[in-house]
Amino acid sequence: MSREKIAETARNFESFHGEITYDQMKCNQFVLAVLREAVDPKFPDLRADDFPASGRFAKVESPLRGDLVHWPGHIGIVIDPNRFEFIGSQDSTGVAAASYSKGYWNGAYGGKQPDCFLRYVE
Protein backbone atom coordinates (compact mmCIF):
# COMPACT_ATOMS: atom_id res chain seq x y z
CA MET A 1 0.00 0.00 0.00
CA SER A 2 1.46 3.34 -1.07
CA ARG A 3 0.27 5.31 1.99
CA GLU A 4 2.18 3.06 4.38
CA LYS A 5 5.29 3.19 2.21
CA ILE A 6 5.05 6.99 2.03
CA ALA A 7 4.77 7.22 5.84
CA GLU A 8 7.65 4.82 6.46
CA THR A 9 9.87 6.59 3.94
CA ALA A 10 9.10 9.94 5.58
CA ARG A 11 9.88 8.55 9.05
CA ASN A 12 13.15 7.03 7.81
CA PHE A 13 14.01 10.25 6.02
CA GLU A 14 13.51 12.16 9.28
CA SER A 15 15.80 9.73 11.11
CA PHE A 16 18.60 9.91 8.59
CA HIS A 17 18.22 13.48 7.39
CA GLY A 18 16.97 15.34 10.46
CA GLU A 19 20.00 17.59 10.32
CA ILE A 20 18.88 19.08 6.99
CA THR A 21 17.76 22.66 7.51
CA TYR A 22 14.92 24.49 5.82
CA ASP A 23 17.44 26.49 3.80
CA GLN A 24 18.68 23.23 2.33
CA MET A 25 15.29 21.61 1.72
CA LYS A 26 11.95 23.34 1.30
CA CYS A 27 8.75 21.58 2.41
CA ASN A 28 7.80 20.60 -1.14
CA GLN A 29 11.29 19.25 -1.80
CA PHE A 30 11.01 17.01 1.25
CA VAL A 31 7.60 15.66 0.20
CA LEU A 32 8.84 15.17 -3.38
CA ALA A 33 11.95 13.30 -2.15
CA VAL A 34 9.72 10.96 -0.13
CA LEU A 35 7.27 10.44 -3.01
CA ARG A 36 10.11 9.77 -5.44
CA GLU A 37 11.54 7.11 -3.15
CA ALA A 38 8.23 5.55 -2.07
CA VAL A 39 6.02 5.85 -5.15
CA ASP A 40 7.63 7.01 -8.41
CA PRO A 41 11.24 8.09 -9.03
CA LYS A 42 9.97 10.37 -11.82
CA PHE A 43 7.34 12.14 -9.72
CA PRO A 44 7.10 15.64 -11.24
CA ASP A 45 8.21 18.80 -9.48
CA LEU A 46 5.39 20.55 -7.62
CA ARG A 47 5.30 23.61 -5.39
CA ALA A 48 3.46 23.23 -2.08
CA ASP A 49 0.34 24.90 -3.44
CA ASP A 50 0.37 22.74 -6.61
CA PHE A 51 -0.27 19.43 -4.80
CA PRO A 52 -4.07 19.83 -4.30
CA ALA A 53 -4.75 20.52 -8.00
CA SER A 54 -2.13 18.18 -9.46
CA GLY A 55 -4.56 15.37 -10.27
CA ARG A 56 -2.36 12.89 -8.39
CA PHE A 57 -4.18 13.30 -5.08
CA ALA A 58 -7.77 13.20 -3.87
CA LYS A 59 -8.94 15.48 -1.07
CA VAL A 60 -10.10 13.53 1.98
CA GLU A 61 -11.87 14.60 5.17
CA SER A 62 -10.22 12.13 7.55
CA PRO A 63 -6.49 11.64 6.98
CA LEU A 64 -4.75 8.30 7.26
CA ARG A 65 -1.08 7.53 7.78
CA GLY A 66 0.80 8.49 4.61
CA ASP A 67 -1.67 11.13 3.41
CA LEU A 68 -0.46 14.68 2.84
CA VAL A 69 -1.50 17.66 4.95
CA HIS A 70 -1.63 21.01 3.14
CA TRP A 71 -1.66 24.61 4.31
CA PRO A 72 -1.43 27.63 2.01
CA GLY A 73 2.28 27.63 1.17
CA HIS A 74 3.18 24.48 3.10
CA ILE A 75 2.92 20.68 2.73
CA GLY A 76 3.76 17.72 4.97
CA ILE A 77 3.10 13.99 5.40
CA VAL A 78 0.69 12.60 8.02
CA ILE A 79 2.49 10.06 10.22
CA ASP A 80 -0.02 9.46 13.00
CA PRO A 81 -3.56 10.77 12.43
CA ASN A 82 -4.63 9.68 15.93
CA ARG A 83 -2.00 12.00 17.43
CA PHE A 84 -2.38 14.60 14.63
CA GLU A 85 1.31 14.22 13.78
CA PHE A 86 3.00 15.03 10.50
CA ILE A 87 6.56 15.24 9.20
CA GLY A 88 7.64 18.17 7.11
CA SER A 89 10.53 20.51 6.57
CA GLN A 90 9.85 23.53 8.75
CA ASP A 91 11.75 26.80 8.97
CA SER A 92 12.40 26.36 12.67
CA THR A 93 13.28 22.65 12.74
CA GLY A 94 14.35 21.38 9.33
CA VAL A 95 12.94 17.90 8.62
CA ALA A 96 11.01 16.97 11.77
CA ALA A 97 7.71 15.79 13.19
CA ALA A 98 5.15 18.29 14.45
CA SER A 99 1.46 18.43 15.37
CA TYR A 100 -1.13 19.83 12.97
CA SER A 101 -3.75 20.10 15.75
CA LYS A 102 -2.07 22.53 18.12
CA GLY A 103 0.43 25.34 18.22
CA TYR A 104 1.67 27.10 15.12
CA TRP A 105 0.39 24.50 12.62
CA ASN A 106 -3.18 24.89 13.90
CA GLY A 107 -3.34 28.66 13.71
CA ALA A 108 -1.60 29.69 16.93
CA TYR A 109 1.11 32.34 17.02
CA GLY A 110 0.11 33.69 13.62
CA GLY A 111 0.33 30.27 11.96
CA LYS A 112 -2.15 28.74 9.57
CA GLN A 113 -4.64 25.91 9.94
CA PRO A 114 -4.48 22.99 7.50
CA ASP A 115 -6.79 23.63 4.56
CA CYS A 116 -6.95 20.05 3.25
CA PHE A 117 -5.69 16.50 3.44
CA LEU A 118 -4.62 14.71 0.27
CA ARG A 119 -4.45 11.00 -0.55
CA TYR A 120 -2.20 9.72 -3.32
CA VAL A 121 -4.22 8.23 -6.16
CA GLU A 122 -2.54 5.17 -7.64
Task: Enumerate the predicted regions with their spans.
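N-terminal capping segments
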Residues: 1-55, 72-73, 87
